[in-house]
Swiss-Prot record:
Lineage, top ranks: Bacteria, Bacillati, Bacillota, Bacilli, Bacillales
Record protein name field: SPbeta prophage-derived uncharacterized protein YosC
Amino acid sequence: MISRASAVYDKLKQAERNIRGDESMQTLDAPIYEVKQESDWYKSEKKRKEDINSFFDKFEEKYGVKEGFSFYHSEYFGVYEGTEAYEIFKNDIVKNQVDGFYAFKKRSKYFKEIKAMIEQIEEVYPFRSHDELGLNNMTGRQWIGDRWFFGVKTEQLVNGDSVVATDYKDYLKIVMEHLD
């Protein structure tokens, strides 16, 4: 699920969250690979992140809701119980929740509007990380500023042209610089 909390990518919003104490940084385990910024994979993911940020800004502007809305794709989105979004959209969501999440009814007056907004987000090939880093070889991923890192289980499975091995000490220096 993509929610505003999981989709805050621009530096100003990230800094605002850090000031409020909403986030603690964790590090990846070695070995580490960085996605090359000139690669098509990096560029498409960066564009997608910008589109998601733009979506949440437009959603907040249109509906006045900042927290509580999440989506998986343009056909499956909804709100979490106990949030501001839940109170606003409670007449337009299904009765049965899944882990506190209520999906929008397909016949809701908001469904088509929100669906169209989500469809503006650029689609990306979801298995690119497996192609570049090896099938089920990732241990985690992390954005630090404009840099995108992956931890992998074994270096032997990495075969992509869009990634470059990063020394763990250099990676930790980047993490420390970002924390300042």
